[in-house]
């Protein structure tokens, strides 16, 4: 007789038809809230409608219902992303010079937009080479398309249509998984299964299939393109996939198929799985064979990782066990209870994910120029500058978002009665020590970093260059950074014996890669100027962290307002009759943190823009002499505040200021308009609610006099609304100004 263990019951993890599809309900503004659904009495109604439409916590207390709404909304988000991608590919197919660029990427610049000749706007269509007139784009799409093996505009059309189909599919999925088959709460909380599927499916199989595409499609097509074969002569992607002999002509080991893999004779594959380091001298991008090797390795890593967590089979890790075992000598209960927090508070979960994704986005920004992954990306200076700037801004916003949702978690989801002596509780109990020390660090960094600049400005003004902090007088060399650079430059042959070149040319050595007479990358020297500005980076980042962390740690209570948790996430002040309690809500800390995030990122992208123009980007003569765009002036000019104002902001703004009448004139108009949007924000930030209410009353009086008064009573923005409108215009105005300044400059000189 065979004794079997009882089969685990199959759990039903969805509810069928939980909520009926009702267009009547959707057509009613504010249907999710009893108050808002009544319709407007005052103009505040429209603001509340927008503020609460996606605040699912305010619609219901049922965690399952909230989870379903979030899940469904994610499909909507994916649909929008597919729609956007489809638009990008369609522009590439319909309005671009992609095929011309592909045939001569060093002389022809990418363009995927042609302006219609309405009221003289055709001036914006600049000559991008090859007889094509259009707007130069700096998104990097052309470079990605070439790297992935797209050789014709027809292929772009097909991809665009495919993305539209996926967009429709995602919209359907969002409706289906809310109205037809909605997952139960247990499904959202099954973290081990989720980890296994996401790690194996998204990251493991995703990387494996990408590596497969790169080997079978991208690699042969890029080989032909690098050898200057006409794109129309190159076999189509499916021919490489279906006909192994085609690949074997380029890479003989292909003839052996999978035999070397199963006989462990893996070195046979070294033709297309390499570990070279450095850049391909033809394209100025990473070696495609290195990239393939990377994706294959990542795939194997995540396929293993995706089998590590305990589900129905009773083997593997349990996240709860791991967290509860995580105790140290000074950490009390450690992570006990964290599992319950992360499976019942999506704000806590989102906060951690935003912090990690934001940091990762900033890491991406730094790798895009130091290890440019796509062909002809490194010599497209406009795209390099745009990608760095874009990823820095996105990373900054995501990190502020992490603090915002951490604070919302503290206010709405944290239960202090059941949390005792775990890590979070211990951090909260010594929050005064944390914040006061962090405050001291900010003061120290601020005075010292700024003080070094002020010293230099003073000495410069007094005509005493020998007393300045500079590479030629009193040196403050970034010795630790230089040591790290040197270690990496020496790594090939020592710590990485298989590699021929270091991971990035920026580390040092004497390697320089130039493509078509333009510098792709070279070793980046660091000196006193970098030491100074890096301490400004440290200062601005620490102040941002101080504001955001104070908002999180004091979200529920403080000495000033012990019952802050009862007032909610956002409130203007602690009620009438208690002065000095405004701007203390967790929301206000996010509001203030956004300004410092803006400061931080601005200094970073200014540093990057000037440093690259001064020390990296430029042309190279036949004799091998490099002529940089700003002639290496960063080291001597950026060591004073005056230098930053005169030789960076003012000198490099000449292109955007003088752009009128040229194809760059749109940037001049944006520069002007975005300054205006930025200035408009100050109206909301510097004036109070009462001022506007008084003005409104008088305007309403005039309307009554003429018998044209509206039924909905006009109201001034609330304090929080005014601040929200203010910070939005401040950031968008500032970012758009910087964008216009950067692009007009780099397109003109790059």
Swiss-Prot record:
Main subcellular location of this protein, as a coarse class: plastid
GO cellular component terms, A-Z: chloroplast thylakoid membrane; photosystem I
Keyword Ribonucleoprotein: no
Top EC class, one word: oxidoreductase
Textual note on the cofactor: P700 is a chlorophyll a/chlorophyll a' dimer, A0 is one or more chlorophyll a, A1 is one or both phylloquinones and FX is a shared 4Fe-4S iron-sulfur center.
Residues holding [4Fe-4S] cluster: 573, 582
Highest taxon, organism lineage: Eukaryota
Bilayer disposition of the protein: Multi-pass membrane protein
Residue positions binding chlorophyll a: 683, 691
Catalysed conversion reaction: reduced [plastocyanin] + hnu + oxidized [2Fe-2S]-[ferredoxin] = oxidized [plastocyanin] + reduced [2Fe-2S]-[ferredoxin]
Classification via InterPro entries: PSI_PsaA (IPR006243), PSI_PsaA/B (IPR001280), PSI_PsaA/B_CS (IPR020586), PSI_PsaA/B_sf (IPR036408)
Description of how the protein assembles with itself and partners: The PsaA/B heterodimer binds the P700 chlorophyll special pair and subsequent electron acceptors. PSI consists of a core antenna complex that captures photons, and an electron transfer chain that converts photonic excitation into a charge separation. The eukaryotic PSI reaction center is composed of at least 11 subunits.
Chain's role: PsaA and PsaB bind P700, the primary electron donor of photosystem I (PSI), as well as the electron acceptors A0, A1 and FX. PSI is a plastocyanin-ferredoxin oxidoreductase, converting photonic excitation into a charge separation, which transfers an electron from the donor P700 chlorophyll pair to the spectroscopically characterized acceptors A0, A1, FX, FA and FB in turn. Oxidized P700 is reduced on the lumenal side of the thylakoid membrane by plastocyanin.
Stated family: Belongs to the PsaA/PsaB family.
Protein name per UniProt: Photosystem I P700 chlorophyll a apoprotein A1
Native source species: Glycine max
């Amino acid at each position: 007789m065979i004794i079997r263990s009882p089969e685990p019951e199959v759990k039903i993890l969805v509810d069928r038809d939980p909520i009926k599809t009702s267009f009547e309900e959707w057509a009613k503004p504010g249907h999710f809230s009893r108050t808002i659904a009544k319709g407007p009495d005052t103009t505040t109604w429209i603001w509340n409608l927008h503020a609460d439409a996606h605040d699912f916590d305010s619609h219901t207390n049922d965690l399952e219902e909230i989870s379903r709404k979030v899940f469904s909304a994610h499909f909507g988000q994916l649909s929008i992303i597919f729609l956007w991608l489809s638009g990008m590919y369609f522009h590439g197919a319909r309005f671009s010079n992609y095929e011309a660029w592909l045939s001569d990427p060093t002389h022809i610049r990418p363009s995927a937009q042609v302006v219609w000749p309405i009221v003289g706007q055709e001036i914006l269509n600049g000559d991008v080479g090859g007889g094509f007139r259009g707007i130069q784009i700096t998104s990097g799409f052309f470079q990605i398309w070439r790297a992935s093996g797209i050789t014709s505009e027809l292929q772009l059309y097909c991809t665009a249509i495919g993305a539209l189909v996926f967009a429709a599919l995602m919209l359907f999925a969002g409706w289906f998984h809310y109205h037809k088959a909605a997952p139960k709460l247990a499904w959202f909380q099954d973290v081990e299964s989720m980890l296994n599927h996401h790690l194996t499916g998204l990251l493991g199989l995703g990387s494996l299939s990408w590596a497969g595409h790169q080997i079978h499609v991208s690699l042969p097509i890029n080989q032909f393109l690098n050898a200057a074969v006409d794109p129309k002569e190159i076999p189509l992607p499916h021919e490489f996939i279906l006909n192994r002999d085609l690949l074997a002509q380029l890479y003989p080991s292909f003839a052996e198929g999978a035999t070397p893999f199963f006989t462990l004779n893996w070195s046979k594959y070294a033709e297309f799985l390499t570990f070279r380091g450095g850049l391909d001298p033809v394209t100025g991008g990473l070696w495609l064979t290195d990239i393939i090797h990377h994706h294959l390795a990542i795939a194997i890593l995540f396929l293993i990782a995706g089998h590590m967590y305990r589900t129905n089979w009773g083997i593997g890790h349990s996240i709860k066990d791991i967290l509860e075992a995580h105790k140290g000598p000074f950490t009390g209960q450690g992570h006990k209870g964290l599992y319950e927090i992360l499976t019942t508070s999506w704000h806590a979960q989102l906060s951690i994910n935003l912090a990690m994704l934001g940091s990762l986005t900033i890491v991406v920004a730094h790798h895009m120029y130091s290890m440019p992954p796509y062909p002809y990306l490194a010599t497209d200076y406009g795209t390099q500058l745009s990608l760095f700037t874009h990823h820095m801004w996105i990373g900054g916003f995501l990190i502020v978002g992490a603090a915002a949702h951490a604070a919302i978690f503290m206010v709405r989801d944290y239960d202090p009665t059941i949390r005792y002596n775990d890590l979070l509780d211990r951090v909260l109990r010594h929050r005064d020590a944390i914040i006061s020390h962090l405050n001291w660090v900010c003061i120290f960094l601020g005075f010292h970093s700024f003080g070094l600049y002020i010293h230099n400005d003073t000495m410069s003004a007094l005509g005493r260059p020998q007393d300045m902090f500079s590479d030629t007088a009193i040196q403050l060399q970034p010795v630790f950074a230089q040591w790290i650079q040197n270690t990496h430059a020496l790594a090939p042959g020592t710590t990485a014996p298989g590699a021929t070149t270091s991971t990035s040319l920026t580390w040092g050595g004497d390697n320089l890669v130039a493509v078509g007479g333009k510098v792709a990358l070279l070793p980046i020297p660091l000196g006193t100027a970098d030491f100074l500005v890096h301490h400004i980076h440290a200062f601005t980042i620490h102040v941002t962290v101080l504001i955001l962390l104070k908002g999180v740690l004091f979200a529920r209570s403080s000495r000033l307002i012990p019952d802050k948790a009862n007032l909610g996430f956002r409130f203007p002040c602690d009620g009438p009759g208690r002065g000095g309690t405004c701007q203390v809500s967790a929301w206000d800390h996010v509001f203030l943190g956004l300004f410092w995030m803006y400061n931080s990122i601005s200094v970073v992208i200014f540093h990057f823009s000037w440093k690259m123009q001064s020390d990296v980007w430029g042309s190279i003569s036949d004799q091998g002499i490099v002529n940089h765009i700003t002639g290496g002036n960063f080291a001597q000019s950026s060591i004073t505040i005056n230098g930053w104002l005169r030789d960076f902001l003012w000198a490099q703004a000449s292109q955007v200021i003088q752009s009128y009448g040229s194809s760059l004139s749109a940037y001049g108009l944006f520069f002007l308009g975005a300054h205006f949007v930025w200035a408009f924000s100050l109206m909301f930030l510097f004036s109070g609610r009462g001022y506007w209410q008084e003005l409104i009353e008088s305007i309403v009086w005039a309307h009554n006099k003429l018998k044209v008064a509206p039924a909905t009573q006009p109201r001034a923005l609330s304090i929080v609304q005014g601040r929200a409108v203010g910070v939005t215009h401040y950031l968008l105005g500032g970012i758009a100004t910087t964008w216009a300044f950067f692009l007009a400059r780099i397109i003109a000189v790059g």
